[in-house]
């Protein structure tokens, strides 16, 4: 694989893959099992590079044109400012993918089933490592290979083909996918409170403030930590000051669940 999104030393990526299968139904010990028409065990492993989320020329330092300025009355020159530091060591995101499964046909090919287990480790995900630099650094940051995500799960499909009379044919089936992922590495600040950590949680984790109740009804207004989100009064929601610093702000956000469903189901009728 090749891409001009990287420096000349990293423009090519070796992407090997291998797969194997065993058709169990072809074995002699299966010949007498009339209910099984086809049965196959399969497995594969591959390494795949990604450039879809990578911008062009991130390996080069970029500059902005800020117009002109005059000096010595009649002399003009251009003004430029730093837009982004380039990173010549930036390289491909890639995934290591492993799959193993079994598929079969039964009862004169009327019943078809398939079960697969998948495991993917996505490495060297590209992002801005702003946790390494102070906020006052401005644009003096660069894109780096800083992330890693693990995805794994199973998917199952089952279908039945039948007929009513000679002319009415039908197929009914169901499928299910169970999938979980976890952020293994990212540019997270060292020493951050455990409730704020993104590492170790699903990538679709939603962070938000923890509601304690209503001011005036559940929580005394005058005894609560200062909430930094505008004016509030009795009847408004009181939020938890999780780090106990006397101020409720973004540093008190905690995991509220995730937006991506772990299990999905489907039914088909033809």
What function would you assign to each model-found segment?
Residues 14, 24-28, 35, 49, ...:
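Outer-membrane beta-barrel strand-turn architecture
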Residues 144, 150, 161-259:
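Conserved small-residue
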Residues 31-93, 112-149, 193:
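Solvent-exposed loop/turn elements at secondary-structure boundaries
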Residues 1-4, 24, 45-49, 117-123, ...:
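Transmembrane beta-strands of outer-membrane beta-barrel pores
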Residues 19-23, 91, 101-105, 116, ...:
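Transmembrane beta-barrel domains of outer membrane proteins
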Residues 37-43, 100, 111-113, 170-172, ...:
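Transmembrane beta-strands of outer-membrane beta-barrel proteins
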Residues 68-112, 141-165, 200-206, 258-263:
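Outer-membrane beta-barrel signature, preferentially recognizing the C-terminal barrel domain
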Residues 2-4, 23-27, 80-86, 136-142, ...:
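Extracytoplasmic loops and strand-loop junctions of Gram-negative outer membrane beta-barrel proteins
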């Amino acid at each position: 694989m090749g891409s001009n999104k990287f420096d000349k030393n990293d423009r090519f990526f070796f992407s090997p893959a291998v797969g194997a299968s065993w058709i169990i139904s072809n074995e002699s010990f299966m010949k007498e099992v009339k209910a099984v028409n086809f049965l196959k065990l399969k497995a594969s492993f591959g390494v795949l590079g990604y450039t879809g989320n990578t911008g062009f020329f991130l390996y080069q330092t970029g500059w902005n044109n800020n117009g002109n300025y005059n000096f010595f009355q009649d002399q003009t020159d251009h003004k430029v400012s730093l837009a982004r530091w380039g990173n010549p060591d930036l390289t491909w995101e890639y995934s290591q993918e492993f799959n193993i499964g079994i598929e079969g046909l039964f009862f004169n090919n009327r019943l078809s089933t398939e079960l697969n287990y998948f495991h993917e480790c996505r490495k060297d995900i590209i992002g801005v490592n702003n946790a390494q630099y102070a906020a006052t650094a401005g644009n003096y940051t660069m894109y780096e290979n800083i992330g890693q995500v693990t995805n794994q799960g199973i998917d199952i499909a089952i279908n039945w083909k039948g007929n009513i009379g000679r002319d009415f044919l039908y197929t009914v089936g169901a499928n299910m996918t169970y999938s979980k992922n976890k952020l293994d590495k990212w540019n997270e600040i060292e020493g951050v409170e455990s409730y704020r950590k993104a590492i170790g949680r699903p990538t679709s984790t939603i962070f938000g403030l923890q509601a304690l109740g209503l001011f005036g009804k559940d929580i005394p207004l005058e005894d609560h930590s200062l909430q930094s989100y505008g004016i509030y009064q009795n009847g408004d929601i009181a939020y938890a000051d999780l780090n106990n610093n006397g101020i409720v702000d973004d540093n008190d956000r905690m995991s509220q669940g995730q937006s991506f469903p772990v299990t999905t189901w489907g039914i088909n009728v033809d």
